[in-house]
Swiss-Prot record:
Main enzyme class: transferase
Signal peptide start-end: none
Descriptive protein name: Serine/threonine-protein kinase tricornered
Flavoprotein as UniProt keyword: no
Essential cofactor(s): Mg(2+)
Record lineage: Eukaryota, Metazoa, Ecdysozoa, Arthropoda, Hexapoda
Regulation: Activated by fry.
Length: 463
């Protein structure tokens, strides 16, 4: 057994086992989280009360009516505290269908047994998170979903855990994801592209204002609600869970010389059949890439691979890649394997080409070029969304009310649990995946998941 040494007041050496050190760390983290939560909860209550008082000032109510609303608010706060004390578990939900699958977990459509409300449940295996050193990414996912409480981010209602798994209970968006929509369509019109790129830009800008960088903007993570409007998902989780999102996966490729690749580039002559075959090949392999542990680096900005630091501008690069895919039918750097895609991304000055047989406007082309360029001059890198508002391609966009308008492509939803816009997983059991409960020392690091549990205040209205 490993141990660590320290000294007592007299200078004598004291040896502590790793088991003792882990227990001490767990106690320290538990206490820190307890008092941190008290401060956070107090601040949240003050914010909710301040919001109520601001609303009361704007309403023409008598003092008696205002007092009644204050009493109702106090009752809601009391009920929320009671709800937070209730222990939530996987047994409180009935699994209806598997609607998503990744390298280390799955997403299920579930129904809460006591209320009948339908949610999307993401299940992540703790052992995988520890083994792959993904705890920080899992924590980022949970923390961003807690903080980003607005219309452009998928809403999380609960998070909890058991000895084996972590669970995120989120709103179910029946429209599916942008990847599925793009696979159904050959290409989108420029009007449709303008709509979805505008909504994605608003979503990206909203999380940047909160101080977060998504780092994994791609069609898979753009979800559509029942009206066809867009929301962002998978914050910090997919970035890193897949090998392709870890720089060391490509480190052995970084020695490749540009000249090694330019010859390959030259061989990709853009004849009509080439573009058509590339689109067909991309769609044929896209689904498998989404579910694999390898994934694809198609949407990742070059500076993310360089290990020289990156900022919010990397998300705007990804938006340019998605815009290209919407108009062309495939992303600009797609290849037969991730290694070649990586080389194309790193040599974007030579590889970002627009095949003449797929005509797009000069305004669209210029916008893509200004997204997929050097980070310091990239569209969105200076003033965020404000950079886009003066771009000709976005002329006519009602940035303030776009979500209130009809979506570019209507979504057909027949019921609250309609999953027709999702893949079928007939070979996957509905039973929540489990693993042997860790034994002995294996459970020692479970303290890293302390404070994972969460219940949203608004969920009180659903109970």
């Amino acid at each position: 057994m490993m141990s660590s040494r320290t000294q007592d007041a007299d200078g004598a050496s004291i040896r502590f086992s790793d088991h003792t050190l882990d227990k001490a760390t767990k106690a320290k983290v538990t206490l820190e989280n307890y008092y941190s939560n008290l401060v956070t909860q107090y601040g949240e209550r003050k914010q909710r009360l301040a919001k109520l008082e601001a609303q009361l000032k704007d309403e023409s109510l008598s003092e008696a009516q205002r007092q009644e609303k204050r009493l109702q608010h106090a009752q809601k706060e009391t009920e929320y505290l009671r709800l937070k004390r209730l222990r939530l578990g996987v047994e409180d939900f009935e699994a209806l269908k598997v609607i998503g699958r990744g390298a280390f977990g799955e997403v299920r459509l579930v129904q809460k047994k006591d209320t009948g409300h339908v949610y999307a449940m993401k299940v992540l295996r703790k052992a995988d998170m520890l083994e792959k050193e993904q705890v920080a990414h899992v924590r980022a996912e949970r923390d961003v979903l807690v903080e980003a409480d607005h219309q452009w981010v998928v809403k999380m209602y609960y998070s909890f855990q058991d000895p084996v798994n972590l669970y995120l209970i989120m709103e179910f968006l029946p429209g599916g994801d942008m990847m599925t929509l793009l696979m159904k369509k050959d290409t989108l019109s420029e009007e449709g592209t303008q709509f979805y790129i505008s909504e994605t830009a608003l979503a990206i800008d909203s999380i940047h204002k909160l101080g977060f960088i998504h780092r994994d903007i791609k069609p898979d993570n753009l979800l559509l609600d029942a009206r066809g409007h867009l929301k962002l998902s998978d914050f910090g989780l997919c970035t890193g869970l897949k090998k392709s999102h870890r720089t060391d996966f490509y480190r052995d490729l970084s020695q490749a010389k540009p000249s090694d690749f330019i010859g390959t580039c030259a061989s990709l002559s853009c004849s009509p059949m080439d573009s058509k075959r590339r689109a067909e090949s991309w769609k044929r392999n896209r689904r498998a890439l989404a579910y694999s542990t390898v994934g694809t680096p198609d949407y990742i900005a070059p500076e993310v691979f360089l290990q020289t630091g990156y900022g919010p501008a990397c998300d705007w690069w990804s938006l340019g890649v998605i815009m290209y895919e919407m108009l062309m039918g495939y992303p600009p750097f797609c290849s037969d394997n991730p290694q070649d895609t990586y080389r194309k991304v790193m040599n974007w000055r030579e590889t970002l080409i627009f095949p003449p047989e797929i005509p797009i406007s000069e305004e669209a082309k210029e916008t893509i070029i200004n997204f997929c360029c050097e980070a310091d001059r990239r569209l969105g890198s200076q003033r965020g969304l404000e950079d886009l508002k003066s771009v000709p391609f976005f002329r006519g966009v009602d940035w303030e009310h776009i979500r209130e308008r009809p979506a570019a492509i209507p979504v057909e939803v027949r019921s609250i649990d309609d999953t027709s816009n999702f893949d079928e997983f007939p070979d996957v059991s509905l039973e929540i995946p489990s693993a042997p409960i860790p034994q002995g020392g294996e459970i020692a690091k479970d303290w890293v998941f302390i404070n994972y549990t969460y219940k949203r205040f608004e969920v009180r209205n659903l109970e």
